[in-house]
Amino acid sequence: MKDLFLFSSLLDASHTFSYFFHIGLVALIAVIVAMMATRSMQLVPRGMQNLGEAFLEGVLSMGRDTMGSEKGARKYLPLVATLGIIVFFSNIIGIIPGFHAPTASLNLTLSLAIIVFVYYHFEGIRAQGFVKYFAHFMGPIKLLAPLMFPIEIVSHLSRVVSLSFRLFGNIKGDDLFLMVILALVPYIAPLPAYVLLTFMAFLQAFIFMILTYVYLAGATVVEEGH
């Protein structure tokens, strides 16, 4: 099956150009939406400001439930909300004919996963100290430390694979699904598919955000008795 037409191919047909073109487009859309939401701030929010505040409050509520505190939720709100915006717009743009979802490429999903991986370890070390943070990797029983430490290392590395491939696989699958639907029935029938794919774009962004909060909570929240 041939690839669907992409507007970026009018400038350059290479996959590398297409990837960076759509990444740049997502960044531009995010900036425009942010400017619209903050252009004329009012005490009683309306329009885009209302939508933006609802989004941030939703992310903050997610953070409170995951981190267990308002302080932790607010501290990581900029990172988690930014990741959510990038992932959502990268997902949703692929639903529009003539555009390609950047999250259907491992280049983006793996990059985002590595950012989360490095950052939550950095925050964990900063919150607990280097020795205490990695002492948790050895488990509560010292005799089992030689076994538990490599298992924990593999477990944490697998989070990069989980974050990146889950998002990549779902969005790539959505792209292929949409391509088949448009090839078979290009007019009225794809409408239910667009609804489903829009829901999936929201869902994958939500999952990425909540997993980021979960990993940050696991790294920075020190349980009593440890």
From Swiss-Prot:
It is found in: Cell inner membrane. The chain crosses the membrane at residues 17-37, 79-99, 105-125, 134-154, 176-196, 199-219. GO terms for molecular function: proton-transporting ATP synthase activity, rotational mechanism. It holds the Pfam family ATP-synt_A. It is a multi-pass membrane protein. PROSITE patterns: ATPASE_A. One of its GO terms (cellular component) is proton-transporting ATP synthase complex. Keywords: ATP synthesis, Cell inner membrane, Cell membrane, CF(0), Hydrogen ion transport, Ion transport, Membrane, Transmembrane, Transmembrane helix, Transport. GO terms for biological process: proton motive force-driven plasma membrane ATP synthesis. F-type ATPases have 2 components, CF(1) - the catalytic core - and CF(0) - the membrane proton channel. CF(1) has five subunits: alpha(3), beta(3), gamma(1), delta(1), epsilon(1). CF(0) has three main subunits: a(1), b(2) and c(9-12). The alpha and beta chains form an alternating ring which encloses part of the gamma chain. CF(1) is attached to CF(0) by a central stalk formed by the gamma and epsilon chains, while a peripheral stalk is formed by the delta and b chains. Key component of the proton channel; it plays a direct role in the translocation of protons across the membrane. Belongs to the ATPase A chain family. This is ATP synthase subunit a. The gene is atpB.
